[in-house]
Swiss-Prot record:
Toprim domain location: 253-333
Cofactor(s) needed: Zn(2+); Mg(2+)
SMART domains (alphabetical): TOPRIM, ZnF_CHCC
Zinc finger (CHC2-type): 38-62
Reactions performed catalytically: ssDNA + n NTP = ssDNA/pppN(pN)n-1 hybrid + (n-1) diphosphate
Positions with a binding annotation for Mg(2+) 1: E259, D304
Protein name, UniProt field: DNA primase
Subunit structure: Monomer. Interacts with DnaB.
One cellular-component annotation, GO: primosome complex
NCBIfam families: dnaG
Tagged with keyword DNA repair: no
Keyword line: DNA replication, DNA-binding, DNA-directed RNA polymerase, Magnesium, Metal-binding, Nucleotidyltransferase, Primosome, Transcription, Transferase, Zinc, Zinc-finger
Enzyme nomenclature, EC number: 2.7.7.101
Length: 600
């Protein structure tokens, strides 16, 4: 802990818990206390009670309880330190740092940096609003749609020439050396001279850096110059606009992501106060992890209407999907960004645009299809394969299955074909080298069984099971008008030839349906009997050439009957001391052997 017990105790007695919780829940007075519907679970009758005199809350519905610090940690996702700093700032309590240690020394440096940033922020805003040289920057902001209220709300400012800035900071007790340490000066050059200044704040509202924008033609440096990284400012972790959007994001579990600071501020100013932007870099996995910490379950991507914006949507969307965040892509008209769209069409049309957004998978498929001049079957197969390569990393197996079903519908291919390709990817990754062994049929199933990994569990798959899968696969992929396959299977095989319970179930269903309606049941109906099992994975692991379907089914039946005959003979010989004492059994085995010869 960085702060003394005395200062924390002072903070505790300064906190008005009703003032804190009242920003997040609708409190109603009930005698000396307050009540509300609990923010931690769904309810219609209020059972969430706040006790002002004790500085405590308790929900008699779900049992949640604690003080203001506990509430911020649970409801807003703050760490303990963040909650303490937030409350200290809100109630104007100066926290006293403990006696110097390595940790407290670093904390002391952070406090010093916060003070420098705050003084700079106040000075920049003063320059924009009060000095003649800030008039040109103010005019530029007005033309971009920034009102005085907006400028004041977001503490937007203007940085003058270096000598003016340095002199003003020295008057406030901040030396040139400290300005260099804080990232304002670099080799005696003021990074932000004659630029519009957008403060970068953390989730608690403390200014941790600046993003500056050039507004004059011919100005020094690039269009944007951001503060260098410091003890407080880490570009890869900062989500711009979080201090204004955190409350609504925590409540609604959704976020709107945009590219630039101006876009973000205008969105928030127009009431879309669940908007965030990356800072200084493009969105990264670290940013997405921060969204997950905030409890975000859905992200709307509202990037610029150009090729770069489309590319960003593809990349950020995949990062979010992998993290378990559902993505909605909202495409702006060509050449527009959220800022210009709001200025030209207003917030209502933007809400409609957000409502019309498409899920990320549909956007991804659309993007890939559009890259081909002609969408032939070969291109369709390529799109399916490329998309599956991404989808296989999106969340739980159940969600992946749902995405694959949607993919099959979007590109109009059988679900089983999509599942088959996914299984082939997994097989190639998990079991390289074993696939060829699994295709060989040897006399002794125990000696030649192969390890097959088709799911969470690993099971020994015998050659017999592989043969049974070959037969069932023919039934699955047989064309509706195909008579030879079901008729041949029905004539030569019976349920006892199938040792795998799942394959036997498919065989029985298929034959009953064929006998009754003279056609096979749908592939989906048959696959439902084995869904989620290793039998299914083995079934869809191999592709089948439908042009050679007749030859394949005949060979599969022949091998299965031959296997069945040899297994029965081996078992019989073992039981009878390798002598065929029973003429009746010998005759029956001979008849089965004849059947094999007839098929071949």
């Amino acid at each position: 802990m960085y702060y003394t017990e005395e200062s924390l105790e002072t903070l505790k007695h300064s906190i008005d818990i009703v003032s804190v919780l009242g920003e997040y829940v609708h409190l109603k007075r009930s005698g000396a206390d307050y009540k509300a519907c609990c923010p931690f679970h769904d309810e219609k009758t209020p059972s969430f009670i706040v006790y002002p005199t004790r500085g405590h809350y308790h929900c008699y519905g779900c049992g949640e309880h604690g003080d203001a610090i506990n509430f911020l940690m649970k409801q807003q996702g703050y760490s303990f330190s963040e909650a303490v700093l937030f409350l200290a700032k809100k109630f104007h309590v100066d926290l006293v740092i403990k006696t110097k240690t390595k940790e407290s020394s670093g904390q002391d440096s952070k406090e010093c940096l916060r003070r420098i940033n705050k003084e700079a922020e106040r000075f920049f805003q003063y320059c924009l609003l009060c000095l003649p040289e800030g008039g040109e920057a103010l005019s530029y902001l007005y033309k971009r749609g920034f009102s005085l209220d907006t400028i004041d709300r977001f503490q937007i400012g203007y940085a003058p020439e270096q000598r003016v800035f340095v002199r003003a900071m020295e008057e406030r007790g901040i030396s040139v050396k400290q300005l260099e340490w804080a990232g304002y000066l670099s080799k005696d050059w003021f990074l932000f001279a004659q630029r519009i200044m957008f403060p970068i704040q953390d989730s608690l509202g403390y200014t941790i850096g600046f993003s500056s924008r050039r507004f004059k033609e011919g100005g020094k440096g690039g269009k944007y110059i951001n503060s260098p990284e410091t003890l407080l400012f880490k570009k890869s972790r900062v989500l711009y606009g979080l201090q204004f959007s955190r409350k609504r994001i925590a409540k609604e579990k959704r976020v709107i992501l945009v590219e630039g600071q101006a876009d973000c501020l205008q969105m928030i100013d127009f009431g879309f106060n669940c908007t965030l932007a990356a800072q200084g870099t493009s969105f990264t996995e670290t940013h997405v992890k921060e969204l997950v910490k905030l409890g975000v379950s859905k992200a709307y991507l509202l990037f610029d209407g150009d090729a770069a914006g489309e590319k960003a949507s593809l990349r950020v969307g995949d990062l979010c999907q992998v993290a378990g965040i559902a993505v909605i892509v909202c495409r702006l008209p060509s050449g527009q960004d959220p800022d210009s769209f709001l200025m030209q069409r207003g917030p209502e049309e933007l809400r409609e645009l957000l409502d019309r957004g498409e899920d990320y998978l549909s956007f991804l498929v659309w993007h890939k299809i559009r890259s081909y001049e002609q969408f032939t079957p070969r291109e369709k197969a390529r799109v399916v394969e490329e998309v599956i390569q991404q989808v296989q990393h999106w969340g739980s197996p159940i969600m992946i299955h749902e995405y694959l079903r949607q993919l099959a519908s979007l590109v109009k291919v059988p679900e089983a074909a999509v599942l088959s390709y996914l299984s082939s990817i997994k097989s190639a990754t998990e079991d390289k080298g074993k696939k060829a062994d699994a295709k060989e049929v040897c006399p002794d199933p125990e000696a030649t069984a192969v390890a097959y990994k088709g799911g969470k569990a690993s099971k020994k798959i015998s050659p017999r099971m592989i043969l049974e899968a070959d037969v069932i696969r023919c039934l699955l992929f047989a064309k509706p008008e195909e008579e030879f396959v079901p008729a041949t299977v029905r004539h030569y095989l019976s349920p006892e030839e199938f040792h795998c319970i799942e394959y036997r179930s498919i065989f029985v269903m298929a034959m009953n349906h064929y006998n009754e309606k003279h056609m096979l049941p749908s592939m989906d109906d048959m696959m439902a009997l084995v869904w989620g099992t290793e039998a299914m994975t083995l079934l869809v692991d191999r592709r089948i050439n439908t042009e050679l379907m007749r030859d394949i089914v005949v060979q599969a039946i022949q091998k299965l009957l031959d296997k069945h005959w040899r297994d029965r003979k081996r078992n019989f010989c073992h039981q009878m001391g390798k002598e065929l004492d029973s003429l009746q059994e010998y005759v029956r085995l001979s008849e089965e052997r004849i059947k094999v010869s007839l098929v071949s």
